[in-house]
Regions:
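Non-transmembrane, aqueous-exposed alpha-helical and coiled segments at domain scale
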Residues: 3-109
Length: 109
């Protein structure tokens, strides 16, 4: 989530928030509290992975914010699966694949 003076800046901050490491928190205590409130609230809905139901719908919520004028507020939200944006796969000459960033995943199974 990005919160800023304009929607353009909010969109940029939202992308920055999406790329933060999972489990990190905003340095601002109020923003960190809002991250936790949003994460708990979204998980309480019970959507689960891919909307199939379950206890957890999100792995985390990150908020990046900047100073803004009280009369305007730009908010942008980026959503993305962690596995879609972080990973490194190595192929050998026989096209065997190894995911060195996710050691528990066997791509050749």
């Amino acid at each position: 989530v990005g919160v800023a003076t304009s929607v353009e800046t909010a969109a940029l901050l939202s992308k920055k928030a999406l790329m933060r490491p999972l489990g990190s928190h905003n340095e601002n205590e109020r923003a960190a509290s809002m991250e936790k409130l949003l994460e708990d609230g979204i998980n309480e809905i019970g959507l689960g992975p891919q909307g199939m139901g379950g206890k957890y719908s999100v792995m985390g919520v990150h908020i990046e914010n900047t100073a803004r004028h009280p009369s305007t507020i730009g908010v942008a939200v980026n959503v993305g699966c962690w596995s879609h944006r972080r990973g490194h796969v190595i192929f050998d000459k026989d096209l065997n694949a190894v995911c060195d960033t996710h050691s528990t995943i066997d791509l050749n199974a």
